[in-house]
Regions:
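Class I SAM-dependent methyltransferase SAM/SAH-binding core
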Residues: 74-117
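Conserved class I S-adenosyl-L-methionine
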Residues: 1-61, 64-71, 160-182
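Short catalytic micro-motifs in class I SAM-dependent methyltransferases
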Residues: 132-136
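A conserved beta-strand element that flanks and buttresses the S-adenosyl-L-methionine
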Residues: 129
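A short glycine-rich, Lys/Arg-flanked "PGG" loop and its adjoining helix->strand segment in the class I
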Residues: 141-156
């Protein structure tokens, strides 16, 4: 429990806090500076782009998957799935993001919704992605149960998350927070989960944890040293984690 009030009120309090936070970001951003909310944002977005284009596209060679992107924001990453998918749906609870996405992209379908409420989204999906969202929720089991209901039972179907590493040193002091968070986010307490919490929550949700990996997303000038940094630096130097689940 993250607060000492009833579950319903606690969840609403947290949801309202993050809703106000995202609205503040949306109302004060413009298209040109969105990717540069922190020094690491550009590299983080670039990593996700490469993962979608180079990795996910190769995992679905036998059929074109139906894709659900939860927390799609303005659809910049969502649109990339259209290159190899039969249908792509993006969901975000911030209306401004959905309006922006619909104005920019014609092929993906975009809807207002959130990770706790996917009932209005029709059908099941071979791939569910949730990039940078879990640090904004407190009920991991409930989120996973909702996702499971949307995950198809076809071969290779999976759900993929990226989120913040709980053990990251970049969560521990003011200088590190300036490097890894936007100005609006640096004073917020984000929710992080251990590997064991992911494992236990997946079991309770009817899913199984199939991959858990520390990501070393580095500033571009350190890119050539990535291999050595992964070998010699502890996992606390990884600010992000990659999590994959499938039906149990």
């Amino acid at each position: 429990r993250s607060c000492n009030i009833p579950d319903g009120k606690c969840r609403k309090l947290i949801k309202d806090s993050f809703e106000n936070y995202w609205k503040n970001i949306y109302q004060n951003k413009n298209t040109n500076n969105y990717e540069f909310q922190s020094l690491q944002s550009k590299e983080t977005i670039d990593w996700h782009k490469k993962y979608i284009q180079n990795c996910i596209s190769n995992q679905f060679k036998k059929y074109k998957p139906r894709v659900l992107d939860i927390g799609c924001c303005s659809g910049n990453l969502t649109n990339l799935f259209c290159q190899f998918s039969s249908e792509v749906v993006g969901v975000d609870y911030e209306e401004g993001f959905i309006k922006n996405a619909n104005s920019k992209y014609s092929v993906p379908k975009f809807f207002i919704g959130d990770i706790y409420n996917l009932d209005k989204i029709d059908g099941s999906f071979d791939l569910v992605v949730c990039f940078g969202v879990l640090q904004n929720i407190n009920d991991l089991v409930l989120a996973l149960k909702n996702i499971k209901l949307k995950l198809s039972t076809r071969n290779h179907s999976k759900v993929v998350f990226t989120t913040i590493n709980q053990n990251s040193i970049f969560n521990r002091n003011d200088l590190s927070l300036k490097l890894t968070r936007s100005r609006e986010a640096k004073n917020l307490t984000l929710h992080t989960f251990t590997k064991d919490q992911f494992y236990q929550s997946s079991k309770l949700s009817g899913l199984k944890l199939t991959r858990y990996e520390y990501l070393y997303i580095l500033p571009r000038f350190l890119g050539p040293l990535r291999f050595f940094i992964k070998k010699i630096m502890p996992t606390s130097f990884s600010h992000h984690i990659f999590v994959e689940m499938q039906h149990a």
